[in-house]
C-alpha cells in the first residue's frame, strides 16, 4: 500500500468556496451550535484499509493556517467581514473532532463539535479519501493522463457545438471533493483557463487564487439541514435559513440550493420576497429539465422576468449534458453549469468514488436531507425523517 510522508492537503483554502461562505454565516449567527456529521460511501468500495493513512493525513492538518498572502486575498472580497477573517487567520483544525475507524472493511468517520469548526472538515476529508484510494488503486495515472482525456472531450465538445451560439455559456469547476488528486484538479482547471473560454471560475478558493479566476459557491445542504433544529418551527426551517443568509450576504452570494427537502417544498417557501432578492437557484438532484421548467414557471407566476435570474446546474454533469441543458434554457434564463467529478476524476479505467459527508445531528437532535432523488436521502433517525416528510408533504416512498 502506498504511504504518504507528506501532507496531501497543504492549505486551508484547498476547500470549496461555500464552506467558507457558510462558516462566516455560522460565525456571526450560530457561534455555539454543535453538530455531528458522518461519512457515507454509496458504492461498494471497501475503504476501511485506508483508515490509518487518513488518520495520519488528518493529523498533519492541525498545522494548517491562513498565510498572510491568503489573508490579504480574502480581504479583497467585499462579503467577507474583518472580524471573521481575523478569527479565520487564527483558526486551526481540531483533530480530536474526527473519529475514524474500520469495521468489516468499511470506513467509518464521525465528526462532532462546534458547527463553525466542524464545517471545514468535509471537503478536505473527502478529497483525501479520493486521492488516497486512487493513488493506491490506479498508481499509474498521472495529471498528463487526465489532460490527454480532457483534450479529447474538449475536441468533441467543440465539434458538437460548432453551430450553437455559446456566447452565454458559463462553466465552473466543482470538482474538489471527489477529485482523482489535487494535481489532477489543478492541471485540469489550468488547461481549461488556457484553452476553454467558457470557464468562469472554480469552487476551490486555493485554485481560484493561484490561477486568478473567480471563486464560486454559496451554501450547501447543511445550511438548511441545521435550521431544522435551530428554529422553533420545523415548517419554517427553510424560510429561516433563507432569511439568515440574506441578513449575512444581502446583495452577494445569492444562489439558493433547492433540494434539501424537495424542489416543490422549496418553492412553497421561495416567495416573492426571496425570489426577488436571490440571484437564482441551484439544481443538485432530480430531473434537471423538469426542475428548470418548474423554476421558470415559478418566477413567471411571481411576476419576475426569468431573464433577470440564474439557474445553476450542478448534478452529475458532463459536457454532453451541459450542451443539452444550455440549448434548452439559455434563451429563457441565465444558466451556469458546475461540473465536478466528470471533470476532475474522469479518466479512462478510473471509477470515481461515490462518497459524501453529511450532517446527521444539530444540537443533539436529528436532521435530514431528502432531495429530489430518492437514493440521495440521508437521515439516521427514521422517526424524524417521517415527521419531516409529513410537515413538508413529501412522500416517504423509496426514501
Swiss-Prot record:
- Whether Methyltransferase counts among this entry's keywords is no
Instruction: Give the Phosphohistidine positions (modified residues).
Output: 221
Q: What is the lineage of its organism?
A: Bacteria, Pseudomonadati, Pseudomonadota, Gammaproteobacteria, Enterobacterales
Q: What is this protein called?
A: Nicotinate phosphoribosyltransferase
Q: Could you tell me which species this protein originates from?
A: Buchnera aphidicola subsp. Acyrthosiphon pisum (strain APS) (Acyrthosiphon pisum symbiotic bacterium)
Q: What is the annotated role of this protein in its UniProt record? A: Catalyzes the synthesis of beta-nicotinate D-ribonucleotide from nicotinate and 5-phospho-D-ribose 1-phosphate at the expense of ATP.
**GO molecular function term, any single one:** nicotinate phosphoribosyltransferase activity
What's the superkingdom here? Bacteria
Catalysed reaction per UniProt?
Answer: nicotinate + 5-phospho-alpha-D-ribose 1-diphosphate + ATP + H2O = nicotinate beta-D-ribonucleotide + ADP + phosphate + diphosphate
Pathway annotation from the record: Cofactor biosynthesis; NAD(+) biosynthesis; nicotinate D-ribonucleotide from nicotinate: step 1/1
Q: Which Gene3D superfamilies match?
A: nicotinate phosphoribosyltransferase (3.20.140.10)
Family per similarity comment: Belongs to the NAPRTase family.
Per the record, the GO terms for biological process are: NAD biosynthetic process via the salvage pathway
